[in-house]
Amino acid sequence: MDKAIVLAVAASLCTATASVCQRAGARNTGPAAGFDARLIIRLARQPAWLLGIAAMIGGFVFQLTALRFGELALVQPILAAELLFVFGFLAVAGPRRPKPRDWLAAAAMSAGIGVFLRLAAPSGGRLHAAGPSWLLAGLVTAAVVLAALAVAFGLRGRPGASRSRRAGVLGAATGISWGFMAAVIKELSSHLGDGIDAIVSTWSLYLLLAAGAATMVLAAHALAAGPLAASQPGFTILDPLTASLLGVFLFGEHIQTGAAALAGEALPLAAVIAGAAALSRSCLVLGENQRPGCPDQPATDRAAHAPGRQPVAASRP
């Protein structure tokens, strides 16, 4: 279990690095008016975005290895610490210093994750999930994504959501998709000791590749649609929650479910959610997206907001 925790923290650090690099690389890419499959092609021309992809791959490797040593319900909540690492990157290299409420939110989120894991005590589970269970989980995830696209971009001539709401809806769908991918990674990790032939012959590898490509496009649109404050809570909160639920549903992992245990788990989980929401709205995390109450933007940020230059972002798997 100790190895799984260390590897999950390393995965979280890598995905945070990927997020920061991809935001930097996407700064000069204009937002899409609707769903644009070519957005990834434009982003691939940015060196910083490619560096973010490399960090993202590193995060995938660490996550895959962590799931080899620990349960899905243990590993995924730790990955929610990604927002803390983003906070740290921006505190060191960003133009603004953290305020006391930023540090309080970070402490609440970090402590909440640790206490939740301690009380939930995830354990057990099987290596493989049944085919019908996978089919149901995949259909539900696909339905959520399609519904999010319809709400975000409109359907049958109806106008889509506003930019902020679009970012929030797509961010939520992306977080759920990442949680589903984590479950697929868990299935794939059970074949790591069987040799390369077993890995390339299993269906979970190809499902992971397809889901990963689709989720990358979805994440790019979520972060391109509007402020990071709108999309980041969906990434940070729904990813581990979805993965934990799938760990129980698909793999039979066990968490403490007694009345007293559930009541105790609810409090730190609420702290995690509140901390993630507060950090995602802070001036440090928003960065180039100015909001009332933040200090004046530095010259570099004002230049990024000059006419014809709209900052957007794209993120991890």
Where are the model-predicted features located?
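Polytopic alpha-helical membrane proteins, predominantly small-molecule transporters/carriers
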Residues: 1-317
